[in-house]
Amino acid sequence: MGRRSGGRKLPFFASNASTSSSTKRTRSARRLPSLTRPRASSSPSPASPSPPPPSASHPAPPSPPLAVSPAGAGKVGKKKAGARLWMRLDRWGVSETLHLDKGSIIRRAGLPPRDLRILGPVFSDSSSILAREKAMVINLEFIRAIVTADEILLLDPLTIDVIPFVEQLTHHLPLKNLVCGNGQPGGDDHGEKHDDSHGDQVPRLNEATGAEHELPFEFQVLELALETVCSSFDVNVSGLERRATPVLEELTKNVSTRNLDRVRTLKSDLTRLLAHVQKVRDEIEHLLDDNEDMAHLYLTRKQLQNQQVEALISSAASNSIVPGGTSLSRLNNSFRRSVSIATSMHLDNDVEDLEMLLEAYFMQLDGIRNRILSVREYIDDTEDYVNIQLDNQRNELIQLQLTLTIASFGIAVNTFIAGAFAMNIQSKLYSIDDGSFFWPFVGGTSSGCFMICIVLLWYARWKKLLGP
């Protein structure tokens, strides 16, 4: 009875129970795919010994890795939701394109999430240069990048406007950062180690800046970004100047709807370009007004100061003879002394270098702004000239209207006299039958009306109501 025969059917409750149990096992297997159990044999053999339990001397073998299906591999290979195209370029010119989301950028550059919103499409028309602890956020027109002391992350590097900036980065940065002032590579990328002495463990700021006061990596990137933006502005202004000259000359010759529409388009483009130039100029002016903000932009100095702190901590930890409290106090004193020396030696020079850099491009942007304003003044002068022409034509129309009004008055007087004699009234003039009085009368009234018109025209000219 306990065994199941091939031809015998099970009761409905037994089949339902077996079906439900198999369904539960299937659901549990779907819920826990990693917990695989060995398949039990149909007839267990009592002679097969059970495996011994794992002990400390015989650890359990590791579980085999899970096999990934091709569909799962395809899902992993796809880019994440919200990921955007970035280009990474380090100080040695090594570049690569990456698809990174906001979380990866935040972890990589140490930025707050609100700074990434500045690089989004909502703030694409704004211009800003923000200094953070480990990075600098640059949003200048079409250039949106995150710059650290060692690399730059450029957003949307394949757009038409950004390609010249990418070419300048790849051509200039390796040449400027390849050799420092002492003839050695400027970075520690090859794993070189310093000596164990305290003087060699602490990085020196003059080694990173170079003997010829070469700009650090972040300032080189900022310089190239400002140069690219200013070059773009200069090209746009030159194009507007070439467009403005023939359009305005044509407008002075012929005031038509087509020419007025061309001038309106030119003026709107000029106003838009002036707004973009003004935003970048105001941002640079804001940085020049605050030395503290300019000092925060020096990311290389911050990195070297952090390396100083790590070197001092390692030197204090290696000194096992001195008690813990004394080592910490010495560590704090050494840190304060090194930071104060580094700040006093390099803060003024670094701010001065950045100030000179920003002032140069501020003057260039100011010159571009003056060129735009000169074109706008040219347009305004042309509009004033056109308005004068239109006023002159309007005055001529008014003079013509006045002349026609005076002539209409004389004709109306003559018509009134003729209409008065056309009425059925008693008059001695009707008794003259030979008609000798008709023509002198008509000629006299017409001459009188003409004289009235002449007198009115002379009076209008005397009052300067009519032109010469």
From Swiss-Prot:
Sequence intervals crossing the membrane: 402-422, 437-457
Membrane topology: Multi-pass membrane protein
Comp. bias regions, Low complexity: 14-23, 31-45
Subcellular location: Membrane
Presence of keyword Transport: yes
Region (Disordered): 1-76, 183-204
GO terms under cellular component: membrane
Comp. bias (Pro residues): 46-67
Biased composition (Basic and acidic residues): 187-201
Main subcellular localisation: membrane
Single Gene Ontology BP annotation: magnesium ion transport
Pfam family, one: MRS2-like
Gene Ontology terms for molecular function: magnesium ion transmembrane transporter activity
UniProt keyword annotation of Cytoplasm present: no
PANTHER family: MAGNESIUM TRANSPORTER MRS2-4-RELATED, RNA SPLICING PROTEIN MRS2, MITOCHONDRIAL
Family, as annotated: Belongs to the CorA metal ion transporter (MIT) (TC 1.A.35.5) family.
Subunit annotation: Interacts with CYCB2-2.
Function: Putative magnesium transporter.
Name of the molecule in the record: Putative magnesium transporter MRS2-G
Organism from which the protein derives: Oryza sativa subsp. japonica
